[in-house]
Curated annotation (Swiss-Prot):
InterPro entries linked: Poly_export (IPR049712), Poly_export_N (IPR003715), SLBB_dom (IPR054765)
Signal peptide: 1-18
Gene name of the record: ctrA
Source organism per UniProt: Neisseria meningitidis serogroup A / serotype 4A (strain DSM 15465 / Z2491)
Species classification: Bacteria, Pseudomonadati, Pseudomonadota, Betaproteobacteria, Neisseriales
Protein name (record): Capsule polysaccharide export outer membrane protein CtrA
Membrane-spanning residues: 30-39, 54-63, 80-89, 114-123, 132-141, 145-154, 158-167, 175-184
Keywords assigned by UniProt, alphabetized: Capsule biogenesis/degradation, Cell outer membrane, Ion transport, Lipoprotein, Membrane, Palmitate, Polysaccharide transport, Porin, Signal, Sugar transport, Transmembrane, Transmembrane beta strand, Transport
Subcellular locations according to the entry: Cell outer membrane
Record GO cellular component, one term: cell outer membrane
UniProt cross-references to Pfam families, sorted A to Z: Poly_export (PF02563), SLBB_2 (PF22461)
Described function: Involved in transport of capsular polysaccharides to the cell surface. May function as a membrane anchor for capsular polysaccharides. Possible porin properties.
Segments in the Extracellular topological domain: 40-53, 90-113, 142-144, 168-174
Lipid-conjugated positions (S-diacylglycerol cysteine): C19
Lipidation (N-palmitoyl cysteine): C19
Periplasmic side: 19-29, 64-79, 124-131, 155-157, 185-387
Length: 387
């Protein structure tokens, strides 16, 4: 009888503190959901969104919209000259040479006198200067058209002049290609350079193809596509335009798994993307004895413009700008069979946190184990001492 009373006293002492002392790998599903139900005085606020087919499809479409085909095609260079281009001008004059008999860079070429002018930079006014001819407007003209203009003006002064004009440095129609350790300005030619030509111009990627993104900036619009998709889909390999910026990004993507899963870890995935169902598979799935299938959450910062319109209005009314990133929790109920379809469309993003809460019954079992294990151990010790 004395032993029983002693055990009961110990049980109640432990019970008083056990609720807050039970170890846990994270918050319960109820606590996570309460984040989206805070009063206005509680900051920062959190957007809580239940994942269904409509939500997953909206996020999937936003990801698919990252496509170079939206830019429309570029165009092959027409070979016309523009401000900043550098020209090489050669002039031949039949004997007897009247204008170019000597000086500058002259040499005999058979019976004709050849003169090479210093390289000519197309000025901000769009002109180049030629001796005895003066300033010539060249912007929008091809080298062939420019040489005919020079030849025509020299005919009245030189003896049977012949002219050749070459574009030696294309500074006006080019594309900037940026990669870690190697960046170039690639001139556009009449051949029509494409995105993969820009990738090749810097020697390709320094990382694995699956870990590389290609970002194209045209004006104020930026789109990013996985290099793997760019190679596999010729429609993405569009013609480039003057002023485009092609950037190669080689940082691999990662997400973090936490809670009632195999183990807490950071998991990498390719730039091509990953669905939520694939992510859960990579982290070893949910633990049968611990996890709450109704408490699967994705934590991320979501750009305001990606939220549903009615939710955007709520945040804008609170003073958030269009560039703001909103702390967002997406809740998935894996106990609902329909969620298995939604998860195949729900895209995981870089730096996401996937958290699986403990099931309520698992918490009860943990509590009972926490309470009665020391009591049982204590009772056994008393029995041993009594004996």
């Amino acid at each position: 009888m004395l032993k029983l009373k002693f055990c009961i006293v110990i049980s109640f002492l432990i019970l008083g503190s056990a609720c807050s002392a039970i170890p846990s790998s994270g918050p319960s599903a109820k606590k996570v959901v309460s984040l989206g139900q805070q009063s206005e005085a509680q900051i920062p606020e959190v957007e809580l969104i239940d994942v269904n087919h409509a939500v997953a499809q909206s996020l999937y479409k936003a990801q698919v919209n990252q496509s170079f085909t939206q830019f429309g095609d570029g165009y092959a260079s027409t070979g016309t000259l523009n401000i900043g281009d550098v020209l090489d001008i050669m002039i031949w004059e039949a004997p007897p040479a009247v204008l170019f008999g000597g000086g500058l860079s002259s040499m005999g070429s058979g019976s004709a006198q050849q003169t090479k002018l210093p390289e000519q930079l197309v000025t901000a006014r769009g002109t180049v200067s030629v001796p005895f001819v003066g300033d010539i407007s060249v912007v929008g003209k091809t080298p062939g058209q420019v040489q005919e203009i020079i030849k025509g003006r020299l005919k009245k002064m030189a003896n049977q002049p012949q002219v050749m004009v070459r574009l030696v440095q294309n500074n006006a129609a080019n594309v900037s290609v940026i990669r870690a350790g190697n960046s170039v300005r690639m001139p556009l030619t009449a051949a029509g350079e494409r995105v993969l030509d820009a990738v090749a111009a810097v020697g390709g990627s320094t990382a694995n193809v699956q870990d590389t993104n290609v970002q194209l900036t045209r004006g104020n619009v930026v789109r990013t596509v996985a290099l793997e998709d760019l190679v596999a889909n010729p429609r993405q390999n569009i013609l480039l335009r003057r002023g485009d910026v092609v950037t190669m990004i080689t940082n691999p993507y990662t997400f973090t798994s936490m809670g009632a899963v195999g183990r807490t870890q950071e998991i990498g995935f390719s730039a091509r993307g990953l669905s939520l169902s694939e992510a859960i598979g990579r982290m070893g799935g949910l633990q049968d004895r611990r996890s709450d299938a109704r408490g699967v959450f994705v934590f991320r910062y979501t750009p305001l413009v990606e939220l549903p319109a009615e939710r955007q209005d709520k945040w804008i009314a609170q003073g958030y700008g269009s560039e703001a990133e909103i702390p967002t929790v997406y809740r998935v109920n894996m106990a609902d069979a329909h969620s298995l379809f939604s998860m195949q469309r729900f895209p995981v993003k870089n730096k996401d946190v996937l958290y699986v809460s403990n099931a309520p019954l698992a918490e009860v079992q943990k509590f009972l184990s926490f309470v009665f294990s020391p009591v049982t151990s204590g009772a056994n010790s008393i029995n041993n001492l009594t004996n």
